[in-house]
Swiss-Prot record:
The lineage of its organism: Bacteria, Bacillati, Actinomycetota, Actinomycetes, Mycobacteriales. GO terms for molecular function: ATP binding; ATP-dependent protein folding chaperone; unfolded protein binding. The modification Phosphothreonine is found at residue 176. Keywords: ATP-binding, Chaperone, Nucleotide-binding, Phosphoprotein, Stress response. Belongs to the heat shock protein 70 family. Induction: By stress conditions e.g. heat shock. Residues 496-515, 569-626 are annotated as: Disordered. This is Chaperone protein DnaK. It comes from Corynebacterium kroppenstedtii (strain DSM 44385 / JCM 11950 / CIP 105744 / CCUG 35717). Residues 496-512 have a biased composition (Basic and acidic residues).
């Protein structure tokens, strides 16, 4: 069995954490950073870039770079078309998860097979199922889907080690907002209530800065930058940077040279100064949207502000001073806890939950809730709720319904999620039919409908005719838009791409090695011209040119062959130098050895586990020392 990790799959950044010796450790990625940008790019040469490398090339590859895909997960109408192939949000998310998995495996030195993945507390069933599908496509066994505020409270609460504490988690990420109230005591983490807004996050603050900049530029130059994709990508990056700087400075300069050109093809520059006061003014309505969910959570939990013991801020967007000030205002002046890293605490909690599920962490029980009510459509289009929001999960509820018409042979069960009174105003999760109902006057048949929500928050619905015993069940996964066959296909596709990526990386290593060998060999020849005959120099140069020529093409075997030839000529050069120096009684064998060694190193694959580095011992000297 491989290792289990906790993953915070974020809108802007993602984090992976693992338990080591019972303590959670955040794993740095291959670039050395503890957070990985949730960005995926398809380069023109077919390479798939993930993380910082994808983010770095976004300006020059706008149409083939995908960011903030989390905002689309669970939406089966969304996809991105790259080279005539459509990718779903699950597939793009899987690319991010694959990188986190690879980086964790590199750090641990062993396979990672299992994961707990976090989602916003206010994610719908479709979004949860889609996230689980993404994990499966990435080659992970998803142990549990956990709400982000719950994971944060788990990490924070266990660290504090206090009894009976009420924690408010205010989670403002890159694309979503959640607020949750939890009670922690004696190893039990129980969610009392949760609320939020899946369409509110740091991206919206960035967009306000972008809008402000485009308006300013249009006023100054009469040019609409929104029609220029490359300019807009530069503006988005500048806006994010400005937002971050305004968390610690009163103002920031936004300077973008050569942002576009005028009618006469003269380059134009964007140069603006944005103050924190102005930034807060243009984003005040976004901040105010977090007030209602906060008040709703208190109401649903039936507690007052004074009952809150600790306030935990989660998500990079909570670093904005205006957010901190609002939270203090809403909580009656309580100072938010500064002891947790808002970017990492969710992944840490996920790793702890993975430890709980794998039996590595004892005496911890996590009791989460369903964020939205679940029910079915009944006569007149009414939403009849079977499970109210903020019900602790896993849970199971049943209710008996009847037919609306005489001799009705079947009933259509339509499952909805939401808080509106009319079913059509809520989110349709799925539908199925129960047939074979015995003929009877309306109101006589008894149809028992059972809702079963598992620990991942994923819904199973069963309808049973008590008279005939006929039964039908649906696992609500339609919302993710993927059948098991599609998921299996995507898993195979992801595995194939992993092989492609590995092959491409190996090919690049061959190229790098070849280029290095040509450079080192030519440098050696240049440094030792007087000691190497012209005939040998010509042979070495001819072989080096062969490598140069091979590097112009795509035939890796041809490059390897050319490298082997150059390696052989280099070793001949080294041999010639040894013989020449021996004849002259010289002591420059080290230089000759360098020539041969350079050829041998560059022409061989050092990945062979049976090859070891060793010092060369002079046998005569060795005997003299005895």
């Amino acid at each position: 069995m491989g290792r289990a990790v906790g993953i915070d799959l974020g809108t802007t950044n993602s984090v992976v954490s693992v338990l080591e010796g019972g303590d959670p450790t955040v794993i740095a990625n291959s670039e050395g950073s503890r957070t990985t940008p949730s960005v995926v790019a398809f380069s023109k040469n077919g390479e798939v870039l993930v993380g910082q490398s994808a983010k770095n090339q976004a300006v020059t590859n706008v149409d083939r770079t995908i960011r903030s895909v989390k905002r689309h997960i669970g939406d089966d109408s969304w996809n991105v078309d790259i080279d005539d192939k459509k990718y779903t949000a699950q597939e793009i998310s899987a690319r991010i998860l694959q990188k986190l998995k690879r980086d964790a495996e590199s750090y641990l030195g062993e396979d990672v097979t299992d994961a707990v993945i976090t989602v916003p507390a206010y994610f719908s069933d479709a979004q949860r199922q889609a996230t689980k599908d993404a994990g499966q496509i990435a080659g992970l066994n998803v142990l549990r889907i956990v709400n982000e505020p719950t994971a944060a409270a788990l990490a924070y609460g266990l660290e504090k080690g206090e009894d009976d504490q009420t924690i408010l988690v205010y989670d403002l990420g890159g694309g979503t907002f959640d607020v949750s109230l939890l009670e922690i005591g004696e190893g039990v983490v129980e969610v009392r209530a949760t609320n939020g807004d899946n369409k509110l996050g740091g991206d919206d603050w960035d967009q306000r800065i972008v809008d402000w900049l485009t308006d300013k530029f249009k006023s100054s130059h009469g040019i609409d930058l929104t029609k220029d994709k490359m300019a807009m990508q530069r503006l988005r990056e500048a806006a994010e940077k400005a937002k971050i700087e305004l968390s610690s400075s009163q103002q920031t300069s936004i300077n973008l040279p050569y942002i576009t050109v005028d009618e006469d093809k003269n380059p134009l520059f964007l140069d603006e100064t944005l103050s924190r006061t102005e930034f807060q003014r243009i984003t005040q309505d976004l901040l105010d949207r977090t007030r209602k969910p906060f008040q709703q959570v208190l109401s649903d939990a039936g507690i007052s502000v004074s009952d809150i013991d600790h306030v935990v801020l989660v998500g990079g967007s909570t670093r904005m001073p205006a957010v901190t000030d609002l939270v203090k205002e809403l909580t009656g002046g309580k100072e938010p806890n500064k002891g947790v890293n808002p970017d990492e605490v969710v992944a840490v909690g996920a790793a702890l939950q993975a430890g709980v599920l794998r039996g590595e962490v004892k005496d911890v029980l996590l009791l989460d809730v369903t964020p939205l009510s679940l029910g079915i459509e009944t006569k007149g289009g009414v939403m009849t709720k079977l499970i109210e929001r903020n019900t602790t999960i896993p849970t199971k509820r049943s209710e008996t319904f009847t037919t609306a018409e005489d001799n009705q042979p079947s009933v259509q069960i339509q499952v909805f999620q939401g808080e509106r009174e009319m079913a059509s105003a809520n989110k349709l999760l799925g539908s199925f039919e129960l047939g074979g109902i015995a003929p009877a006057p309306r109101g006589i048949p008894q149809i028992e409908v059972t809702f079963d929500i598992d620990a991942n928050g994923i819904v199973h619905v069963t309808a049973k005719d008590k008279g005939t015993g006929k039964e039908n069940t649906i696992k609500i996964q339609d919302g993710s838009g993927l059948s098991q066959d599609e998921i299996d296909r995507m898993v195979k596709d992801a595995e194939a791409h992993a092989e492609e990526d590995k092959k491409r990386r190996e090919e690049q290593e061959v190229r790098n090695s070849a280029e290095s060998m040509v450079y080192q060999t030519r440098k050696f020849v240049d440094d030792n011209k007087e000691k190497v005959s012209q005939d040998i120099q010509d042979k070495v140069e001819e072989a080096a040119k062969g490598v140069d020529e091979a590097l112009k093409g795509d035939d890796i075997e041809a490059i390897k062959s050319a490298v082997e030839k150059l390696s052989a000529e280099s070793q001949e050069m080294g041999k010639s130098l040894y013989e020449s120096e021996a004849a002259n009684g010289g002591t420059t064998g080290g230089a000759a050895g360098a020539a041969g060694a350079a050829g041998a190193d560059a022409g061989s694959d050092n990945s062979d586990p049976n090859v070891v580095d060793a010092e060369v011992v002079d046998e005569d000297k060795k005997d003299d020392d005895k």
